[in-house]
């Protein structure tokens, strides 16, 4: 649906300029903003919007709201986007209005305003259902069911009373619920935290709503149930009203063998964002400060709950997802298309099997001998990097790749600050 945004905006601009037919006009900068948005080039969009601070059109209210939403200024985003949809109800730019509702739904979800998230998704179905593709419509209906079921659940709260340094065992650490201690990992690539069904049953976790479908990193769709844990403790940190996706244990058959501990779940992006800042060290510590200090480089944003970081490659600005659940860095079709000639001339096509939650998939790839880039303030060089040539899931359609934990081999620590939206490597 994003591909219709530029066309919709051009119709608006054409109508507005109809009195000037026959006169040659300079390209309208709003068209560039629309292209940056639909291509998920959020860092360039932010900078372009900032340069248009004196522009006061209704369309600018949409783009300012979009920038606020992806850079985690949720109160401002909601205000701007609500102003846009209310003002544009009778306007012609229907695809922009639809995108505004998508961003509003996401802002409500990340704020823990689940009832409003469901209402925004329902608005999309009611107003635009006839023009949605099947996958997008199914996903929207799925989210209406999910957030409607959680409508009466209070927003998640995280209480960090003191600086915490947690010694991990193979990147797993103990949490406590109802007096029961078990191990979990952490995964910024997971839109919801995860509990295995066995521990959810043991803890009598309350389940809300019907089964929902989620898309895994391999592009496969799996069924899960939604549960809420009223209180979980990580050392002295208290996590309240955390939403978990409850999945069958058989989706994680090798957890104990891989990690050497009895892992029963994952803390996903909503809980990690609630910590405000996390630092993972090469030596295996997870550091969570009580009061994160301000950071000055805004080089990270959100796509949904997925952190996206800015990467410099040969002077070009790329956007890569940051997935702490991925052991390796991958490059995706947008990168392949941009550098196709060079990649094809230097490597032969091959197949690779990717594992994910509950499934695996074989994908066509090329392999780069070396990928040198700058991220988080540090120059990095990775060898034998797979370049996916076909789209397998949503992130592979819009972003240049995924940064995995192999970058930690060249750093002492990695910090994600969700207040300043900063990604820092040291």
What positions do the PLM features span?
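Positively charged n-region of N-terminal signal peptides that target proteins for export
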Residues: 1-4
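Bacterial N-terminal signal peptides
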Residues: 7-16
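Pepsin/retropepsin-fold aspartyl endopeptidases
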Residues: 20-426
């Amino acid at each position: 649906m994003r591909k219709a945004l530029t066309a919709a905006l051009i119709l608006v601009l054409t109508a507005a300029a109809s009195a000037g037919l026959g006169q040659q006009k300079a390209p309208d900068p709003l068209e560039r903003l629309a292209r940056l948005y639909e291509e998920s080039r959020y860092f360039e969009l932010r900078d372009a919007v900032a340069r248009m601070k004196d522009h006061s059109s209704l369309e600018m209210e949409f783009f300012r709201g979009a920038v606020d939403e992806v850079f985690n200024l949720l109160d401002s985003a909601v205000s701007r986007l609500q102003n846009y949809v209310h003002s544009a109800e009778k306007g012609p730019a229907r695809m922009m209005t639809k995108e505004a509702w998508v961003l509003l739904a996401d802002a409500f979800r990340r704020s823990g305003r689940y009832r409003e998230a469901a209402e925004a998704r329902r608005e999309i179905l009611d107003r635009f259902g006839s023009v949605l593709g099947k996958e997008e419509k199914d996903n929207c209906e799925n989210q209406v069911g999910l957030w409607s079921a959680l409508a009466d659940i209070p927003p998640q709260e995280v209480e960090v009373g003191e600086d915490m340094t947690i010694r991990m065992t193979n990147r797993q650490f103990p949490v406590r619920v109802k007096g029961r201690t078990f191990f979990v990992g952490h995964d910024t690539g997971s839109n919801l935290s995860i509990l295995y069904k066995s521990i959810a049953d043991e803890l009598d976790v309350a389940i809300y709503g019907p089964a929902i479908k989620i898309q895994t990193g391999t592009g496969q769709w799996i069924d899960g149930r939604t549960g809420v844990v009223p209180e979980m403790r990580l050392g002295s940190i208290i996590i309240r009203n955390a939403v978990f996706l409850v999945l069958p244990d058989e989706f994680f058959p090798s957890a104990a063998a891989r990690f050497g501990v009895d892992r029963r779940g994952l803390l996903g992006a909503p809980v990690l964002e609630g910590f405000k800042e996390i630092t993972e060290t090469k030596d295996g510590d997870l550091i969570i400060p009580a009061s994160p200090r301000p950071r000055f480089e805004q080089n990270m944003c959100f796509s949904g709950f997925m952190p996206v970081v800015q990467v410099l490659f040969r002077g070009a600005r790329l956007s890569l997802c940051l997935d702490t659940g991925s052991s390796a860095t991958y490059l995706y079709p947008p990168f392949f298309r941009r550098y196709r000639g060079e990649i094809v001339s230097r490597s032969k096509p091959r197949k690779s099997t990717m594992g994910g939650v509950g499934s695996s998939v074989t994908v066509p790839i090329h392999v780069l001998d070396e990928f040198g880039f700058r991220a988080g303030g540090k120059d990095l060089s990775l060898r034998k990097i797979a370049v996916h040539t076909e789209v397998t899931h949503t992130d592979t359609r819009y972003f240049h790749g995924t940064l995995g934990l192999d970058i930690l081999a060249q750093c002492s620590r990695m910090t994600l600050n969700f207040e300043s939206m900063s990604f820092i490597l040291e």
